[in-house]
Curated annotation (Swiss-Prot):
Miscellaneous section: Heme 1 (or BL or b562) is low-potential and absorbs at about 562 nm, and heme 2 (or BH or b566) is high-potential and absorbs at about 566 nm.
PROSITE patterns: CYTB_CTER (PS51003), CYTB_NTER (PS51002)
Matching PANTHER family: CYTOCHROME B
Topology term for the membrane: Multi-pass membrane protein
One function term, GO molecular function aspect: ubiquinol-cytochrome-c reductase activity
Gene: MT-CYB
Protein name: Cytochrome b
Its biological purpose: Component of the ubiquinol-cytochrome c reductase complex (complex III or cytochrome b-c1 complex) that is part of the mitochondrial respiratory chain. The b-c1 complex mediates electron transfer from ubiquinol to cytochrome c. Contributes to the generation of a proton gradient across the mitochondrial membrane that is then used for ATP synthesis.
Residue ranges crossing the lipid bilayer per the database entry: 33-53, 77-98, 113-133, 178-198, 226-246, 288-308, 320-340, 347-367
Keywords: Electron transport, Heme, Iron, Membrane, Metal-binding, Mitochondrion, Mitochondrion inner membrane, Respiratory chain, Transmembrane, Transmembrane helix, Transport, Ubiquinone
Classification via SUPFAM superfamilies: a domain/subunit of cytochrome bc1 complex (Ubiquinol-cytochrome c reductase), Transmembrane di-heme cytochromes
InterPro entries attached to this UniProt entry: Cyt_b/b6_C, Cyt_b/b6_C_sf, Cyt_b/b6_N, Cytb/b6-like_sf, Cytochrome_b, Cytochrome_b_C_euk/bac, Cytochrome_b_N_euk/bac, Di-haem_cyt_TM
Cofactor: heme b
Length: 379
């Protein structure tokens, strides 16, 4: 009798994706983050579902409904903080996952990479609309500032902003539609993640050497299932340490003040995972220029396959490119720090230099260094 997992129409799909999938024998722990992102997504959908059962998307009651969840609902506080800090873990995994793709040249899988960039945009959109829901000061002013950026679009900008707001300011209509978006987007992310996996399994995984591994494959189960379970345990451990010991570490104290349109907070800033893009936005004095730079900071990832001039796929044997990669990581950390600082000297100039360096490394220096490395190897 043949095994049911190989014959049953549904089980066959699961089997080919998670059990009998031929995987390279040498993929390191940097390859764990795809599965961790899946776990983060499931965790966010589940905690979000329970939060939505008690949340009300009305400007008069949104803030107090979140307080009610934390104080009166059984284990509401842990669900709320798992959801808030789960978003941070999601973005940590996301940034490492993208960084891994850049380092090991995984962007040469064009379809997988492009779907991944779309996924990144979608997750960022979801996190943004979600941050508005508690209706604290930073929620309200963050929504006002970021949606207002669309007014920089020539001719249709102002109409577009008012259309998104559902009125002439961020108000009840905005909150209601943001809640609707925040509820539907994770399911769109889940669907896109399946397409992402579908394209990945067409080509098979990359590996640290960047060399085709067709000659040396091992089954996904039990080797990588065990490895993924270890990663998942470490993820849940770090999340629970954050939730139980420092739940407000990554949040903004201003968001514990109910939204007040008449009182602007001294420093409007988004959550930490948007600070690098926010710093790039602020470093350009022109509104439209800032918006274009903001979008380009993520959209530049789509160009990575075109900018790959090296004759080797991975950076593992390219020390000059490695140096440049880690300078880029340091630059992004600098931008994240600058995004959280007030707009004053010396932070303005540091932000501008870091923003220039970011685009310079990706668009100019990396292709040049790769060509130099080719010449050094007489290729």
């Amino acid at each position: 009798m043949t095994n049911i997992r190989k014959t049953h129409p549904l089980m066959k799909i699961v089997n080919n994706a998670f059990i009998d999938l031929p995987a390279p024998s040498n993929i390191s722990s940097w390859w764990n983050f795809g599965s961790l992102l899946g776990i983060c997504l499931i965790l966010q959908i589940l905690t979000g579902l329970f939060l939505a059962m008690h949340y009300t998307s009305d400007t008069m009651t949104a803030f107090s409904s979140v307080t009610h969840i934390c104080r009166d609902v059984n284990y509401g506080w842990i669900i709320r903080y798992m959801h808030a800090n789960g978003a941070s873990m999601f973005f940590i995994c996301l940034f490492i996952h993208v960084g891994r793709g850049l380092y090991y040249g995984s962007y040469t899988f064009l379809e997988t990479w492009n779907i991944g960039v779309i996924l990144l945009f979608t997750v960022m959109a979801t996190a943004f609309v979600g941050y508005v829901l508690p209706w604290g000061q930073m929620s309200f002013w963050g929504a006002t500032v970021i949606t207002n950026l669309l007014s920089a679009i020539p001719y249709i900008g102002t109409n577009l902003v008012e259309w998104i707001w559902g009125g002439f300011s961020v108000d009840k209509a905005t909150l209601t539609r943001f809640f609707a978006f925040h509820f539907i987007l994770p399911f769109i992310i889940a669907a896109l993640a399946m397409v992402h996996l579908l394209f990945l399994h067409e080509t098979g995984s990359n590996n640290p050497t960047g060399i085709p591994s067709d000659a040396d494959k091992i089954p996904f189960h039990p080797y990588y299932t065990i490895k993924d379970i270890l990663g998942a345990l470490l993820l849940i451990l770090s999340l629970m340490l954050l939730v139980l010991f420092a739940p407000d570490l990554l949040g903004d104290p201003d968001n514990y003040t109910p939204a007040n349109p008449l009182n602007t907070p001294p420093h409007i800033k988004p959550e930490w995972y948007f600070l690098f893009a926010y710093a790039i936005l602020r470093s350009i004095p022109n509104k439209l220029g800032g918006v274009l730079a903001l979008i380009s900071s993520i959209l530049v990832l789509i160009l990575m396959p075109l900018l790959h001039t090296s004759k080797q796929r991975s950076m593992i044997f390219r020390p000059l490119s490695q140096c440049l990669f880690w300078i880029l990581v340091a630059d992004l950390l600098t931008l994240t720090w600058i995004g959280g600082q007030p707009v004053e000297h010396p932070f303005i100039i540091i932000g501008q230099l870091a923003s220039i360096l970011y685009f310079l490394i990706i668009l100019v220096l990396m292709p040049i260094i790769s060509t130099i490395e080719n010449n050094l190897l007489k290729w």
